[in-house]
Amino acid sequence: MKTVREMNSGELAAFVCSHLDRYGIRVALSGGAVVSIYASGNYVSKDLDFIDLLQTTRQKLKKVLKQIGFEEKSRYFVSKETEFFIEFPSGPLAVGNEPVEKLAELQFETGRLRLLSPTDCVKDRLSAFYHWGDRQCLQQAVWVAQMKPIDWVEIKRWSRQEGAEEKFVEFRAELQDNSNR
């Protein structure tokens, strides 16, 4: 198996997720690192945002992550072996105002990774665009939608629920513009 130093973000996230699983700590990857995995190199995030699905104590997380070389530094866990760092944003796991119902799983040489589905990843990025006008997140949503199958009916329904039908139309136009380039 690869060393931590040799792992890309997906491999490291799977390694961490599998290690935590062995100790009864159930996490799911969210945020920009999911974009990195689904958008195949269009975007790189050094921050691995794991949502703790069971509300594990910080003390237990520290103990278990130390076993694989990660030390707590402020709100992050860092290792001398990698430029990637781990964070545990507070849950629950949600996109916009809705909880995530079903997670995706990917198998890597380094372990199994639970993460947002491509559709929920797009919704997560669109949430930042819809509510804060974050155009970088809009671009990330476009990249994922170009690279992975997306449930368009679900994204349209969710966008309506978020009160962002006009911005959904803008997202579709941006996707079309990017496809024509």
Q: Which role does the model predict for each range below?
A:
Residues 1-181:
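Compositionally biased terminal segments of proteins
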